[in-house]
Amino acid sequence: EIGSGLVGSEMCIRDSCLYFGLMLTPNGPKVIEYNCRFGDPETQVVLPMLEGDLCEIFEAIYEHRLADVKIGWKSGYCTCVVMASGGYPVKYKKGIEMFGMDDKGQVDGAFIYHAGTKYENGKFYTNGGRVLGVTCNAYTLQGALDKSYEAVSKIKFEGEHFRKDIGQKALKALPKDSLDLEYKQD
């Protein structure tokens, strides 16, 4: 059924990515959206696992030579916890000072993706509903989750909130013997 929306006389072929937002249901996966762009926050867990140069990949797409580029992926898992402003998604305050990040807006051991932030006079402030994507990778899913939530615990701002159930369904779905599985790096 998706094909009818993707193919037709008005379909414009582009050299880009195709992003699908999926939801698992008792009747199988369902598409809730698709776009010719990266998804947010989904991309935050993909990019840290990429081995190689993203700019080289984009250049190869532009030059129609993507088949010539070796694209590899790191072993392990990556998780992202979105920190949101109080009141999000309805009504939220902007301009709340944020604490716990270094002067580059990072936390040791994590990738901090700024979404609704503003940097002014050497300080970070909230400037939107979804404020940060706190992303960590590790050899195990539990390890990645632990690192993400540890980094979240270091970042403070009035009204902050975040989901505490990220990755829990995946942990339950993994075979029991895979929870402590560690991958060897080549």
Stretches with model-predicted labels:
Residues 1-8, 12-13:
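Single conserved hydrophobic/aromatic residue that forms the stacking wall/gate
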Residues 1-2, 45, 133-134:
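Short, flexible active-site loop motifs that bind/organize anionic cofactors or intermediates
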Residues 16, 56-57, 89-90:
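Short, structured loop/turn "capping" segments at alpha-beta junctions
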Residues 32-46, 87-89, 118-120:
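Glycine-rich phosphate/pyrophosphate-binding beta-alpha loops
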Residues 60-186:
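Peripheral (often C-terminal) accessory segments that flank ATP-dependent C-N-forming ligase machineries
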